[in-house]
Amino acid sequence: MTRQKILITGASSGLGAGMARVFAAKGRDLALCARRTDRLDELKSELGQRYPNVTVAVSALDVNDHEQVPKVFAELSDALGGVDRVVVNAGIGKGAPLGSGKLLANKTTIETNLVAALVQIETALEMFKTSGSGHLVLISSVLGARGVPGVKAAYAASKAGVRSLGESLRAEYRSGPIKVSVIEPGYIESEMTAKSNSTMLMVDNATGVKALVDAIEREPGRAAVPWWPWAPLVQVMRVLPPRLTKWFA
């Protein structure tokens, strides 16, 4: 099934903007939202020039402003005449070692990556129930497969939470009419990973985003991307002794 009208959160940069470019090249209409409206406007202009037959609607949205999420989703849906896929992508990579006295960074990460994701999920489900169908895509991470020490502890926990919500929804809607996919990116070049000390198995943005979109289009229940090496590595991560998980942090 071709999902023609796609809403992406956190679309002003990184994986969100990359997905928007790839979907636009496929001729899909886009509803894009993020905090940085200047970047969104630039992206809309870029896509409009390259793909004049594609409709691109943009709106400012801070996903931590929970009351705004349903309002912005509704406005963007109206602009496109409906939405049949929502990609819950907005997130941050802040963090500090647990017990380091830097609670705010970890709290903000959990709130943005998990609590705000829950708000987006609830909003998308209401939209899909009204329309009768839809594809909900949750962007988790390979780090959601296993807790890790250091600065990524809260990030990994938040993405594990997203993964768990997705698994619950897949069971809830196992017979439809809503499809749910949990996508677990490995290390893909972006503004977020540029701030990371780990470059292990990093792939360039274009390669990573293509793998991401290809996986979304297949509408799997769950997928690590790029498949190689991350799909087998995720299985390894789940059984590693705790002392060895530092290599993924």
Predicted segments, located by residue:
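Active-site helix of classical SDR
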Residues: 121, 158
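C-terminal helical subdomain
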Residues: 182, 197-234
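Residue(s) in the substrate-gating loop at a strand-loop-helix junction
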Residues: 141
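Substrate-binding pocket helix/loop in short-chain dehydrogenase/reductase
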Residues: 97-110
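Conserved glycine-rich Rossmann-like NAD(P)H-binding loop of the short-chain dehydrogenase/reductase
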Residues: 26-43
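The beta1-alpha1 cofactor-binding region of Rossmann-like NAD(H)/NADP(H)-dependent oxidoreductases
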Residues: 37, 60-71, 103
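Conserved glycine-rich cofactor-binding loop
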Residues: 12-14
